[in-house]
């Protein structure tokens, strides 16, 4: 039994060290925005009538204006498509893609993201879930980080807004696993793609 305790203590100590490393070497986005390269905002959406309009408003209010926004309507049965269409009619940067039936060899969100990428023409692609909120100069600062560090992939850790007790119990586990088991400073230095991890929001 004592050996089991040693194993648990050792594993916990490793997690603590990884977490401390991630705090100490945490990178923040630059305060200033990058040059105005075209950024493609790609949003897969299925039955998102309660959230999609908030995100579209956020995008319109961004300081970074050189964007194109594609929303993939994945056969929604609610008012998602109509809401997006209102923005398409008013703003030439917004586009709606109505998805077809899912092929048997695809998963829903993966297929939606693939279809979105096929339509995009920006220098950078920013994938967002429909329930995400973005504020301030986040797009420009994100591009500045990628340009400065010559990155091909950048994943952000967003603030998680949790409403129910179920969300409060489960959602933090995602960041817990990443931040205590994955030393991000090594990920940034490693040439192995298998060491990469990204947030799926």
Sequence positions of predicted segments:
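Short aromatic/hydrophobic "clamp" motif used to bind/position activated sugar donors
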Residues: 113, 125
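N-terminal membrane-anchoring/stem segments of glycan-assembly enzymes
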Residues: 1-35, 172, 184
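Long helical/loop segments within the catalytic core of UDP-sugar-dependent glycosyltransferases
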Residues: 98, 102-112, 141, 145-201
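Cell-envelope/extracellular polymer assembly enzymes that use nucleotide-activated donors
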Residues: 37-40, 68
